[in-house]
Curated annotation (Swiss-Prot):
It is an enzyme of class 1 (oxidoreductase). This is NADP-specific glutamate dehydrogenase. The keyword NADP applies. Belongs to the Glu/Leu/Phe/Val dehydrogenases family. The active site is at K125. SMART domains: ELFV_dehydrog. It catalyses: L-glutamate + NADP(+) + H2O = 2-oxoglutarate + NH4(+) + NADPH + H(+). PROSITE patterns: GLFV_DEHYDROGENASE (PS00074). GO terms for cellular component: cytosol. One of its GO terms (biological process) is glutamate biosynthetic process.
Amino acid sequence: MPAQTIEELIAVIKQRDGHMTEFRQAVEEVVDSLKVIFEREPKYIPIFERMLEPERVIIFRVPWMDDAGRINVNRGFRVQYNSALGPYKGGLRFHPSVNLSILKFLGFEQILKNSLTTLPMGGGKGGSDFDPKGKSDNEVMRFCQSFMTELQRHVGADTDVPAGDIGVGAREIGYLYGQYKRLRNEFTGVLTGKNVKWGGSFIRPEATGYGAVYFLEEMCKDNNTVIRGKNVLLSGSGNVAQFACEKLIQLGAKVLTFSDSNGTIVDKDGFNEEKLAHLMYLKNEKRGRVSEFKDKYPSVAYYEGKKPWECFEGQMDCIMPCATQNEVSGDDATRLVGLGLKFVAEGANMPSTAEAVHVYHAKGVMYGPAKASNAGGVSVSGLEMSQNSVRLQWTAEEVDQKLRGIMRGIFVACRDTAKKYGHPKNYQMGANIAGFLKVADSMIEQGCV
């Protein structure tokens, strides 16, 4: 029997996926927001239960040879979650932590995120427990070629369009696309995040970071303030954090921190364009650590083994967690509120724990959840798909303008939906309800499939 009540739905989740910690956390957060919908219209409860099951989960081995001639084996995944709105769309993550729970959580979030963009994209996610760190270019290439040799059977421009994520940047996308083209003998938009020279879109590398800042800007406007002059703590130092910093500098905010898995750098004077350029060189070309930033700028403080939320001292206004899931704890959130935290715009996927989100709401912090605030990346991926389908390439200015419009539309949907259901300024609830209803109604209209 399908679940008919909220209690039965929660029991089903615990029974089927109780061991999948990250997935359960993501689902329970959404269920909490959707209770108001389920109480008004119980017909949506069995639809949500059906939505929890991926349409398809593909697991495969990835054998590859290292530079010493040894055969290594990693595990590859693709979770094709929901295609009610369009082809499966979502990134590939290469990281030792990758498992089915993490990919199901990311794929589930991707369904709602893609729905919010209003672009015709379903939800999916994939990756491998392969770690590109410490590997030579040739080793990464051989792994990517082996990975795509199996994945190519399951993807396509009208079926499933992967992109990058943690551990999958421009280099990896290039190797993956080259192998797909070699095997299928077709030049098509099967991946997004491609180089602009061969089918990519301008602003795609910048899109997630830029989009999160645009969402933060809209939150500020909605609360009668401006982003200019705000002190912002960033975590991470990869693609998302770098371009969030770039846009924050352009809009007049002050960025005070960056981090990686080893520690955090704090610059009380704020990062300017020159400092950001050096950080980009360290991370993108030298593939170094943020601790090396201190070699050129000795006035910067470095905190070994610390996150920005644990070591920053001083007045601040906003945080943009751009590293990984569950990086901001309830204790971190409480500490940040004491330092003046007023706005959170998430650049990473689910970077705040449930306890941290509870603190945000309890203390009146304006919270932009990942599925809304970091949707810029997949939005421009959708625009890349559109450009590929008609063999056109828009200018950077055109894409940035479209991105800003999409992020504005996402914010308005979150704001208006939250207000409609009696929870004004609860952008998290607005995002969950608006994203869910579009997918759920589409599933109802398409029948039992």
